[in-house]
């Protein structure tokens, strides 16, 4: 092979790569395809005096094109806990439904403030091992400071004796949140009592109905460890939940149930018909235990409906300590 021609070929490819990386367009793969067609093809002699047309160009360009192509592919997160990519506006929670937005605002959903994604995962039916819905858990943007204001060094030494003095307060709090189910429930419940606003986005991965969604919420709430001490109050709250979920009928795959935890502890339920892009505010549950127990189960404890969503959410909360 002519080394001079090979060197020129590589220089041309390097110039193409640099040009596409600096392109204002976000799709570097399309940029490469446009520019590569203008590069002059060259012949190189092969073995036994035969001639291979363009093969060095093809090999090198394939490597380059593959790099650019996968650089522009959307992020996929089925059963993964990767950090949120900073350059995207959404993330794939499950491949069978639409990506979840990293930010939810009153401009695109019937919510009271701006929410940022904390964590995500899927809900599985344990004994059958099939997925039921994708779940995203969000925190009000203006309430991020409540995490460090509530779970701080003073809180740590006031309520816990097993503090490792060789660790920082943040490391001790992180250990308790991640490794001690009973203490994590106490910590998350105190955090929710601070008035922290949250939001859950539930997107079915198969066709279902409002009855099944409501039953799932009731089961999740009923698994909170403090239910036995609050039976009467919670019973009234579940009655409110039943009224808020009075709508009947089917819920299509990829529709959304939006559950907003308000500052006063109330829950607002909204439904998004994704096919027609229509929203409906279904109702409000004012009983504070319902909202507190529901989001507590999402965030902590051994009976969380989505361990993946719990893990990714706790990991994100720890960064806010």
UniProtKB/Swiss-Prot annotation:
Identify the keywords attached in UniProt to this record, alphabetized: Mitochondrion, Transit peptide
**Homology family:** Belongs to the AIM18/AIM46 family.
Superkingdom field: Eukaryota
Its localization reads: Mitochondrion
Q: Mostly located where? A: mitochondrion
> What is the originating organism of this protein?
Saccharomyces cerevisiae (strain AWRI1631) (Baker's yeast)
Under InterPro entries, the record lists: Chalcone_isomerase, Chalcone_isomerase_3-sand, Chalcone_isomerase_sf
Record-level GO cellular component terms: mitochondrion
Q: Could you tell me which Gene3D superfamilies the record lists for this protein?
A: 3.50.70.10
Q: Which residues form a coiled coil?
A: none
**Any one GO molecular-function label of the UniProt entry:** intramolecular lyase activity
Mind telling me what this protein is named? Altered inheritance of mitochondria protein 18, mitochondrial
> Which residues does the Swiss-Prot or TrEMBL entry list as transit peptide?
1-72
């Amino acid at each position: 092979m002519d080394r001079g021609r090979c060197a020129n070929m590589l220089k041309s490819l390097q110039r193409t790569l640099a040009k596409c990386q600096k392109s204002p367009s976000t799709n570097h793969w399309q940029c490469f395809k446009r520019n590569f067609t203008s590069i002059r093809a060259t012949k190189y002699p092969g073995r036994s005096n035969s001639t291979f047309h363009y093969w060095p160009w093809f090999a090198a360009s394939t490597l380059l094109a593959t790099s650019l192509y996968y650089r522009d592919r959307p992020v996929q997160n089925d059963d993964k806990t990767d950090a949120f990519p900073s350059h995207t506006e959404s993330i794939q929670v499950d491949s069978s439904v639409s990506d979840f937005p990293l930010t939810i605002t009153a401009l695109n959903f019937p919510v009271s403030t701006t929410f940022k994604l904390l964590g995500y995962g899927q809900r599985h039916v344990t004994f059958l091992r099939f997925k039921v819905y994708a779940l995203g858990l969000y925190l009000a943007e203006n309430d991020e400071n409540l995490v460090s204001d509530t779970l701080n060094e003073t809180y740590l030494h006031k309520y816990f004796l097993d503090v490792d003095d060789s660790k920082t307060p943040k490391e001790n709090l992180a250990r308790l949140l991640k490794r001690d189910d009973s203490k994590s429930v106490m910590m998350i419940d105190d955090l929710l009592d601070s008035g922290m606003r949250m939001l859950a986005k539930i997107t079915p991965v198969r066709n279902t109905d409002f009855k099944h969604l409501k039953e799932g919420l009731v089961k999740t709430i009923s698994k909170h460890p403090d239910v036995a001490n609050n039976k009467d109050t919670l019973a009234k709250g579940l009655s409110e939940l039943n009224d808020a979920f009075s709508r009947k009928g089917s819920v299509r795959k990829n529709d959304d149930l939006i559950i907003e935890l308000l500052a006063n502890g109330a829950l607002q339920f909204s439904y998004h018909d994704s096919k027609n892009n229509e929203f409906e505010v279904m109702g409000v549950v004012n009983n504070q235990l319902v909202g507190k127990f529901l989001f507590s189960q999402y965030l902590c404890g051994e009976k969380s409906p989505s361990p993946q969503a719990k893990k990714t959410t706790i990991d994100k909360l720890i960064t806010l300590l």
